[in-house]
Amino acid sequence: MAVLPQVDLGHLANRDTAFVIVGAFFAWVFVVNPIYLLYFHPLSKFPGPKFWAVTRWGVSLAIISGKSHDIILDLHKKYGPILRIAPDELAFQSVSAWNDIGGHRKPGQPEMTKEPIFNEAFKDNLLGVTTREDHSRMRRILSRGFSAATFQKQEPLLKGYVDLLLSELRKRCEGGQKLIDIQTWYSFTAFDIIGDLTFGESFGSLDSGGHHPWASLIFETTRFVILANCLKRINRAFLPVLLFITPKGFGRRLKENQQLTDAKIAKRRALGASRPDYMTAMLGNDEKGAKLSDTEITSNCTALILGGAETISSALSGTTYYLTKNPEAMAKVIEEVRSAFSSEDEITLTGTGHLKYLNAVITESLRMFPPFAGASPRQVPRGGATIAGEFIPAGTSVGIWHWSMARCPDFFTHANEFHPERWLDDPRFDNDKKDASQPFAVGPRNCIGMNLTYVELRLILARLFWNFDIKLDKSCDNWVDDMVEYFGWEKIPLMVSLTPRS
């Protein structure tokens, strides 16, 4: 009689259990969870791409592409003003949403805090600090460096750097015969000014005609931080991927950059509160006696330079681009500047504040080309909130993409056209919802440097238009369309000819 083979029933049971577990996992990931997210999740009533509703990969890939601003605008056109861009995130294209999300709150009323993972890299500075109390403390201390009285004290410093910029442009333009990448020179100027106001010394970019390694690394770091944030918001398990895509020597350069930052801060701190700059503000107390920690000082220095320099250089470049693309507007602003002053010495912070058309040009440029085109997501607090007339459950990430607001034809007549007159009570634009454009955000967490930005832009542009006639090279006709954006524009050359005023 044949002997039957022995069967390890325990092994079969274990194998069957494994198959069940694996099968259940795949059923959950690819069937059950997507069905729940699409049809039963609290956000399922809001429209958007189905793939984006079941995974964060959709919006993450859009951000990584550098074209998320265009993609989100197109999706709003297709799906409407409230757009589901991830399983737990909504994007709004609504004027009232600005205040619903970021506006001032009554005492005891919870605010919508910065989304913690997105802002993790900025948790120790004004850009991303989470709690209302810490933000208020930082803001009170830093605001002294951005007061009108401080601007007046800073004017000689600003004037010196504008003098240097104009001198370098005059030397290099060869009477209008040689093309100049003016956005690079704007960047040099912005970094030198913000470096001086933060560290007590410039980066030397205008003198050397090149970016300091510190500034160069800022550009590289920004893209890396955005990529890391996208992976973290999908799942932190993806973070090891960064090890394989990190540029060679990046970690070493980051360490060297931190050492340089520490050295610059130590050198500036040794001078004490001796200059009308940001460090003087950061070394002080608020009215309650609160201070910034050493970590917060270091982090805010980096944030001020990143936010300040990039905002100024982007705004200068965008304004120059749109004026050179619109000769009638350029002629008007040049006429205003050159007729308002009898000599260049009269072009001051106070004097340029009265240039109505120049101010309208700057405001329109910031609408057309906001320095930050994307969204800085907030988190709906416990109990939920009403945004744009819709109840949004607690824990939802919400945001407004600057680009999608500024380019929306529901808010602006000829939304994709450059018309400074829309800010000067021109009846053609009476139906514009001008509050839709908020390049510096709204509420208690709006950009602390907004007024400084306007001050610098007016001074630099007025003196540039006083001294030069400017013409855009044809190679840059599609300058804005050719760029990508990662928490700020990754700018490409803006080639112009500068002809000294005769």
UniProtKB/Swiss-Prot annotation:
Keyword Metal-binding attached: yes
Source domain of life: Eukaryota
Pathway: Secondary metabolite biosynthesis
Membrane topology reported for the UniProt record: Single-pass membrane protein
TM regions (residue ranges): 18-38
Pfam family, one: p450
InterPro entries: Cyt_P450 (IPR001128), Cyt_P450_E_grp-I (IPR002401), Cyt_P450_sf (IPR036396), Cytochrome_P450_monoxygenase (IPR050121)
Cofactor needs: heme
Cellular component aspect of the GO annotation: membrane
Subcellular location: Membrane
Molecular function via GO: heme binding; iron ion binding; monooxygenase activity; oxidoreductase activity, acting on paired donors, with incorporation or reduction of molecular oxygen
Biotechnology: Hypothemycin is an antifungal agent that exhibits excellent activity against Peronophythora litchii, which could be helpful for the storage of harvest litchi fruit. Hypothemycin is a strong inhibitor of a subset of MAP kinases such as human ERK2. It can therefore be used as an anti-cancer drug thanks to its inhibitory activity of Ras-mediated cellular signals. It can also inhibit Trypanosoma brucei kinase TbCLK1 which is a good candidate as a therapeutic target for African trypanosomiasis. Finally, hypothemycin also has inhibitor activity of T cell activation.
Class of enzymatic activity (EC top level): oxidoreductase
Glycosylation sites: 300, 451
Binding site for heme: 447
UniProt keyword list: Glycoprotein, Heme, Iron, Membrane, Metal-binding, Monooxygenase, Oxidoreductase, Transmembrane, Transmembrane helix
EC numbers, comma separated: 1.-.-.-
Family of the protein in this entry: Belongs to the cytochrome P450 family.
Function: Cytochrome P450 monooxygenase; part of the gene cluster that mediates the biosynthesis of hypothemycin, a resorcylic acid lactone (RAL) that irreversibly inhibits a subset of protein kinases with a conserved cysteine in the ATP binding site such as human ERK2. The first step is performed by both PKSs hmp3 and hmp8 and leads to the production of 7',8'-dehydrozearalenol (DHZ). The highly reducing PKS hpm8 synthesizes the reduced hexaketide (7S,11S,2E,8E)-7,11-dihydroxy-dodeca-2,8-dienoate, which is transferred downstream to the non-reducing PKS hpm3.
Protein name: Cytochrome P450 monooxygenase hmp1
Source organism per UniProt: Hypomyces subiculosus
Taxonomic classification: Eukaryota, Fungi, Dikarya, Ascomycota, Pezizomycotina
